[in-house]
Amino acid sequence: MSRKVIAAGNWKMNKTPKEAVEFVQALKGRVADADTEVVVGVPFVCLPGVVEAAKGSNIKVAAQNMHWEEKGAFTGEVSGPMLAELGVDYVIIGHSERRQYFGETDETVNKKVHAAFKYGLKPIICVGESLTQREQGVTAELVRYQVKIALLGLSAEQVKEAVIAYEPIWAIGTGKTATNEQAEEVCGIIRECIKELYGQDVAEAIRIQYGGSVNAANAAELFNMPNIDGGLVGGASLKLDDFEKIAKYNK
């Protein structure tokens, strides 16, 4: 089965609403002929303008987080129905920065993934190990555990629609990239884990990204690996030229 490569930008806390709209308007024409699925993950306040700017193009829009409840006394949070009403396509769940700074756990990731599907959003589920964990040789064990908990209670059809992003924490924003072989190995472990849980068909269908200092220079080699179906791109997704090259890695 051929899986459509997904080039997703995670802007993190960057760009004002005006800057975001200008960026997407400029990006549209540049990636119109891309074979990849192009996604921009923008701050909450940028979502309305970016969804509008992306209309009629092949750019999909992602939120960077969501709450698992529909509504309620959760000051500062944003719910699935709010994102769905805006026309958001994807939501990034469990990014390492959310886990590190904001108390995200494997259990809250699972609740958010269920909420995403309930409200028609596709989750981009982030998993990955720290440098210490890699050095201790527990990468495979840890990532398998994160995947299993994140997907707990989901149907096979839901899992096929999900995206998993392997982001080694030691390679995020550090300039260190996992070697192609390291990235491929862990993405392969994730696919094998999905196969054990949901069978061969689901494992073949689900898209697994690599995230961790993906840039215009290394995207093609990474995306051509058998088990890597694109990237969750940080800093390089904030630069038009770089993100265009990543989205069109095969041209």
From Swiss-Prot:
E.C. no: 5.3.1.1
Q: Name one GO cellular component term.
A: cytosol
Is Isomerase set as a keyword in this record?
yes
| Molecular function as annotated in GO | triose-phosphate isomerase activity
Q: In which pathway does it act?
A: Carbohydrate biosynthesis; gluconeogenesis; Carbohydrate degradation; glycolysis; D-glyceraldehyde 3-phosphate from glycerone phosphate: step 1/1
Q: Does the keyword Plastid apply?
A: no
Q: Which residues of the sequence carry a binding annotation for substrate? A: N10, W11, K12, G173, S213, G234, G235
Q: Which reaction does it catalyse?
A: D-glyceraldehyde 3-phosphate = dihydroxyacetone phosphate
Protein role: Involved in the gluconeogenesis. Catalyzes stereospecifically the conversion of dihydroxyacetone phosphate (DHAP) to D-glyceraldehyde-3-phosphate (G3P).
* Designated name of the protein: Triosephosphate isomerase
Species source reads Acetivibrio thermocellus (strain ATCC 27405 / DSM 1237 / JCM 9322 / NBRC 103400 / NCIMB 10682 / NRRL B-4536 / VPI 7372)
Identify the gene encoding this protein.
tpiA
